[in-house]
Each structure stands twice: as C-alpha cells, then as structure tokens.
Design a protein with these regions (language model features):
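Extended, charged/polar low-complexity intrinsically disordered regions
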Residues: 1-51
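Active-site-adjacent bridging/hinge elements
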Residues: 38-47, 264-275
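AAA+ P-loop ATPase catalytic core
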Residues: 66-73, 269-272, 290-302, 322
C-alpha cells in the first residue's frame, strides 16, 4: 500500500484492554488523596512542581512553564505545541530538556536531519521514504530549541505543520503525496528582549498565534542567585513527592484517557473566548484557534487531575493560563490574573493561591456576563 500505516501506540491499546482503569503508582495515589479535600488546582500544581530536579530550577519557580509542559504532555491527537519566550531562558531550557525524558521518543532538533520525511533510495537503488525528525518523534516531543537558530525554510515548515496539524510525505514513483496527522508535540524557545526577538524572528507573531501554549518566562534575580548558591552544595538532597519514574508512568496513562466536557466548563471557555475577543477591539490578539486550545487545555488539566469529566474549575485553569500568557504578550489584562511568583513550594498550594484562583474565577464570570449582553447571537452560533 502507498504511504505509511498509522500504528496505534501501546498506551491507548493498554487503555482499551483495561477499560480506561488507571494503574497509578503509590506515590501518586497518596498525593491525590492528600489533595482531594483541598483546592481543585492543588494536585496538578504539585505535579508541575515535581518536573525536573532542584538542580534544573527551584521547585517553586517557573510554574507557568511547568504547567505548560504538563498540558503539552497530557494531550494526544492534535498536540499542544509549546513556545517559551524570555530574556534569560537558562533555567527554562534545563527544565525543558529534563521534561523531554517524560515522553516516548524524545527528540532534539538537528539541522543534519530533515524536519519531515524525504524521498530517498535504499542500497538497491529503490525509492523509499526516509523518516524526518517529526516522524522519529512520533508520540513524543520534538524540541526545536532556539527559533532564531533555525533556517527560514525550516521556520516556515514548522509554522505550516503546526497550523495544519499534519505532515506531508513526498510522492513515490507510483504513489501520490500523502498526509498524516502530526503526532509529535513541538517545543521551541525565543530568547532576548522583545526588540531582539522581533529582529531575529521576523514572524514571531505567527508563532505566537499558532503555538497553543505560549509562556513568557521570567525569573527574578534573587531566585536565580539563591538557586546558584544552593545548587552548588555537595550535600544538596532533593526529595520529590512524586519520583521522575512515577510521574512518567502517570502521564503515559492519563494522556490517552477520554475526557468529556461538562456544559458549565464548555460555557465558561466559550464565554471567555468571546469576551476576550470583544474586549480587545479587533480580536486579532485572540485568534480563532484560541477556543480549540482552551478546550484542549481544560481536557489536559482534567486528565492530570485524574478526572474523566472536565469541570468548570478545569476551564478556569485553562483561562487563567491563557490570560496570563496574553497579558504578558500584549501588556495588559482586563482580568488581572494573579502572577505566578512564589517564594516557596508551599505558596503554590497555600490559601493565598487558592483565594487568587477563586477571585480570578469570579472576575472571569463577571466579564463574561457583562460582555455577553453585547455579543451578537450569530457570533456565538459560529463557534458552537
């Protein structure tokens, strides 16, 4: 037959055989039970803090990036690509490289290998398809690194692949070109001031629009200094609540789990999407694809929280992530999302963080109600 046959990965086959029942590591079960009576965001936040080691980055720092990594890893089918922007991405880069090991087929981009499949000849001279890096990273992650270091042709190819959600295989002598869904998540970084990034990456706005998860990563100097001082200690011990192996097992099981969205969750996401577009004039800062991204983020948050149904709080987590990224990108927010800046791991799940998320939920609901009165019904029908 022409083209390549899509083989179902082992994890979804396991889901079918076990009827969706999870076989969770003991550390995950104990942590989930301990968090069950707390905030609906606590368990996922603690999981995010467990990414990497304390040598990569302080566990209380870069929470927005940590959540973005988890959201990307906890999706299947149309994957959530991740773009990290900042003036100093040393700690972010360490965290990304460490998180790569949580997925199958982790791949770091090399300019020596084609991005997608190319036509080649085998030793006998017969035509064949040579897998590119997107195919080799199937079911995993392709870490592109610095966008500024990529050739213009590769950047355009990346934009096309992410926007269409598919990779194209070249035509064989007797077979037409074929397409397959993109099965790898793409991670990339853009480092420098906004002026430098605009100069080095002419189409950075296009990348921000098509990459579902955009994180503006900034770490204050005091956090970096403390990290450098403490990480140099020879006797530094790291005792994560969930080991690296257990976290990998959890992600591998939950990302193929089917999640249904409750009406309240879908209504919140749709209302937030419409309100965000209307409150920003032309709406160009919030692309049409944003709603699909919000839905997938809510589903990913529900999976990570071990729920098979995405509830309203999962939608709030998705809206908060998106609004935080949008505020950093355009310089303002109508909702004033609480900043992810913590001085300790306890702050991530403390009462203040819980109250901040509850306040954001209320602000979000009020904005949706206010702007929904001025939203034409035709606009709602077009996206539902």
């Amino acid at each position: 037959m022409c083209g390549l046959e899509q083989v179902k990965p082992a994890a979804p086959r396991h889901q079918e055989l076990t009827n969706g029942q999870l076989q969770l590591p003991g550390s995950v079960v104990r942590l989930h039970q301990a968090c069950n009576s707390n905030s609906p965001y606590t368990f996922v936040r603690i999981l995010a803090s467990q990414l990497g080691s304390v040598l990569d980055a302080p566990r209380h720092a870069l929470l927005q990036l940590r959540l973005g990594i988890l959201f990307s890893l906890a999706t299947h089918g149309p994957r959530l690509p991740l773009l990290v922007i900042g003036t100093d991405l040393v700690l972010a880069h360490r965290l990304l490289r460490s998180a790569l090991q949580l997925c199958p087929n982790p791949t770091v981009y090399s300019h020596l290998i084609p991005l997608s499949a190319v036509l080649a000849r085998d030793t006998s001279g017969a035509h064949c398809l040579q897998a590119g890096q997107l195919q080799r990273a199937e079911d995993g992650v392709l870490y592109l690194g610095q966008l500024a270091a990529l050739k213009s042709s590769v950047k355009q190819q990346v934009l096309s692949v992410v926007e269409t959600g598919a990779t194209t295989f070249p035509a064989l002598p007797r077979c037409p070109p074929t397409q397959q869904p993109l099965a790898a998540a793409l991670w990339a970084t853009a480092e420098g001031s906004s002026t430098v990034i605009q100069k080095n990456i002419k189409d950075i706005e296009s990348f921000c629009n098509v990459f579902g998860l955009v994180v503006h990563s900034e770490v204050d100097d005091e956090t970096v200094m403390q990290h450098c001082l403490f990480s140099s200690y020879d006797d530094l011990h790291d005792s994560p609540k969930v080991s690296f192996e257990d976290l990998a097992r959890l992600i591998d099981q939950v990302r193929y789990r089917k999640v249904t969205l409750t009406e309240s969750c879908r209504s919140l996401l749709t209302g937030y999407f419409l309100a965000s577009r209307r409150s920003r004039g032309s709406g160009s800062e919030v692309p049409q694809t944003a709603l699909a991204t919000l839905l997938r983020m809510a589903e990913a948050h529900a999976r990570l929280a071990l729920r098979q149904e995405a509830v309203e709080e999962d939608g709030v987590a998705a809206c908060h992530f998106y609004e935080t990224s949008l505020a950093a990108q355009v310089g303002y927010s109508h909702l004033e999302p609480p900043a992810f800046s913590f001085s300790s791991l306890g702050d991530i799940v403390g009462d203040v963080a819980k109250e901040d998320m509850e306040m954001f939920h209320r602000y979000c609901s009020v904005m949706i109600i206010m702007l929904s009165k001025h939203t034409p019904s035709s606009e709602v029908l077009n996206i539902t």
